[in-house]
Design a protein with these regions (language model features):
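Short linear sequence motif anchored by a di-proline
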Residues: 1-201
Length: 201
């Protein structure tokens, strides 16, 4: 599971790393939480060009009655992307990358828990695999862009912290993940520990 993450880099860093023309202004945070708005990278459905937008964490499908639905959809299990009603349309049409400086997991028992930060070994960002949706408020008609982070089975040391981990897309595969026609199976395989640094938060 990924329930908190760190995005402490500024918009200029995201723009350069993810090769987008601009990034909306946002406040860098060491503790991004569900329902908060943060940058995502997507392919614009009209221009078919890569861009960054601000979106709300917690995917809300177009058919959902209200934004509360998103609290159940902060993570999307990779095993259910094709079958789950909440995710299958977005998986076929609306993939995104979620820029993070690191993400967090906890170990230990209640009252004695240790918070761990998992971050890239040799680059400023992870690009986490995500899906995005646009939901329209039934009262105002205002659009709300939302997203979820795709998870897979954890491997290596991370498996000792949690049985799930985000799908981390390496920079050479960003374009492939953003292309919904691409179904390369290696896109969905957990990265090796060699590319990760795990440290007390």
């Amino acid at each position: 599971m990924c329930g908190r993450y760190d995005l402490s880099e500024n918009p200029a860093g995201i723009r350069a790393h993810f090769d987008v023309p601009s990034v909306p202004q946002f406040t860098p945070s060491r503790d991004v939480r569900p329902t908060e708005r943060a940058p995502i990278i997507r392919v614009n459905p009209l221009s078919i060009k890569r861009e960054s937008i601000l979106a709300r964490w917690g995917l809300v499908p177009a058919w959902a009655k209200d934004l509360k639905f998103g609290s159940r959809c902060i993570n999307a299990r990779i095993e259910r992307l094709v079958t789950a009603q909440a995710y299958r349309t977005a998986f076929r049409n609306r993939r995104c990358l979620v820029p993070v400086s690191g993400f967090f997991e906890w170990s230990g028992t209640s009252g004695q828990r240790t918070k761990w930060r998992i971050c890239p070994q040799d680059q400023p960002f992870f690009g986490l695999a995500g899906l995005w949706e646009r939901w329209f408020d039934p009262g105002s008609g205002e659009p709300v862009d939302t997203y979820t982070i795709v998870t897979t089975a954890a491997n290596g040391t991370l498996a000792g912290l949690h049985d799930r981990m985000p799908v981390i897309v390496t920079p050479d595969r960003y374009a492939s993940w953003l292309d919904p026609t691409c179904m390369q199976m290696d896109l969905f395989v957990p990265v090796t520990e060699a590319g990760l640094r795990i440290e007390p938060a």
